[in-house]
Amino acid sequence: MAKKKAFIPFFYFTSIVFLPWLISLCCNKSLKTWITNWWNTRQCETFLNDIQEKSVLEKFIQLEELFQLDEMIKEYPETDLQQFRLGIHKETIQFIKIHNEYRIHTILHFSTNLISFVILSGYSFWGKEKLFILNSWVQEFLYNLSDTIKAFSILLLTDLCIGFHSPHGWELMIGYIYKDFGFAHYEQILSGLVSTFPVILDTIFKYWIFRYLNRVSPSLVVIYHAIND
């Protein structure tokens, strides 16, 4: 009976790890057809931010330049001009299809992330007792570690998150989140987040060392500074 009770929190933790993937898989299969039909039948008004609007305008300017080129080469045989116009027409249709697929992808991922957040929030609230048990296990495990291992682990974690080579990792992670939520890639916003977020984390971490670790385990702070130096 005791083993069964001990297994329940572990099973709950495993379900939390894999639940977002299952939700994403189910939502992508069930919502994609519905969102595609809704987008195509409602003929929704296109909602673009400034960055996406600029990209769309650039594409249409390129097409307009092709049409102007078409007018400049009237001396070409009529058959060649017809093929040229047909090629431009196909490119325009292809661009519209790509744009529609991008908007459907954006709505689908935003809806999936919203549903995942709601389900995980309810699931976590429902299993808060199991989370308390898992938290006690983690605290007991960390308490049994030596101060040297704790200091080394903290140093490794901080170097990964806010170290010299961390901006590239943050750039990849923030870029993935942007793409997952369907946001357009904007280099200035991405660079601003990459340059400021690690600094904020570094400040919070130093405050945590000053306020918490100095009070709980002064020896751990001494070992950490010795390894860091």
Curated annotation (Swiss-Prot):
It catalyses: K(+)(in) + H(+)(out) = K(+)(out) + H(+)(in). One of its GO terms (cellular component) is chloroplast inner membrane. Keywords: Antiport, Chloroplast, Hydrogen ion transport, Ion transport, Membrane, Plastid, Plastid inner membrane, Potassium, Potassium transport, Transmembrane, Transmembrane helix, Transport. Contributes to K(+)/H(+) antiport activity by supporting proton efflux to control proton extrusion and homeostasis in chloroplasts in a light-dependent manner to modulate photosynthesis. Prevents excessive induction of non-photochemical quenching (NPQ) under continuous-light conditions. Indirectly promotes efficient inorganic carbon uptake into chloroplasts. This is Potassium/proton antiporter CemA. InterPro entries: CemA. It is a multi-pass membrane protein. The keyword Transport applies. Belongs to the CemA family. The chain crosses the membrane at residues 6-26, 107-127, 189-209. Signal peptide: none annotated. GO terms for biological process: potassium ion transport. Its main location: plastid. The keyword Ribosomal protein does not apply. It is found in: Plastid, Chloroplast inner membrane. It comes from the Eukaryota. One of its GO terms (molecular function) is antiporter activity.
